């Protein structure tokens, strides 16, 4: 984009899941490359929240079990998060959901990152009191009936509730 004349501050990247974590990593390491980022349900290491029973045992015990069972990925995750936290200003709008099986209950570290604006989408599968559905050409399905509903909340029609927030974030980055 830059080579065709688009100013860097007008480039806003976004990513979902592992792409969401990569968005955070890029903006923390190279904030001058783009104008900002939007991260949805950032996670690259499997269904940590559900598999390691974070709700039952707590984040520390769950992450300790993850580190014992998969030391390489656990160390990589910790290193990536620590590198993101070291940045002076990570201009990212980050969406999380507590019922995301991947890292929904392990996302509080985002609160420690300067510049990140974290939005916890909801506590259930509704946004602003409305049930969430995903639609296709000739079908629709409640998000709560899907295999990974918390991880897919940003794909539901109810997520349009956040359109204004996203537009305001983008406008703030263009100034």
Q: Model-predicted segments: where are they?
A:
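C-terminal catalytic histidine-bearing segment of alpha/beta-hydrolase fold enzymes
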Residues: 116-175
């Amino acid at each position: 984009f830059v080579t065709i004349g688009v100013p860097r501050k007008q480039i806003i990247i976004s990513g979902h899941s592992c792409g969401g974590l990569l968005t955070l990593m890029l903006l923390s390491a190279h904030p001058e490359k783009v104008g900002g980022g939007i991260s949805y349900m950032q996670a690259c290491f499997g269904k940590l929240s559900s598999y390691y029973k974070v709700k039952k045992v707590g984040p520390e015990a769950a992450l300790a079990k993850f580190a014992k069972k998969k030391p390489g990925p656990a160390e990589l995750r910790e290193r990536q998060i620590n590198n993101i936290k070291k940045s002076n200003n990570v201009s990212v709008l980050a969406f999380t959901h507590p019922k995301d099986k991947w890292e929904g209950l392990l996302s509080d570290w985002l609160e420690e990152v300067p510049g990140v604006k974290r939005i916890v989408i909801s506590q259930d599968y509704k946004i602003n009191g409305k049930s969430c559905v995903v639609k296709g050409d000739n079908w629709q399905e409640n998000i709560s009936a899907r295999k990974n509903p918390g991880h897919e909340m940003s794909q539901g029609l109810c997520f349009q509730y956040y359109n204004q927030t996203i537009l305001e974030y983008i406008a703030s980055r263009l100034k």
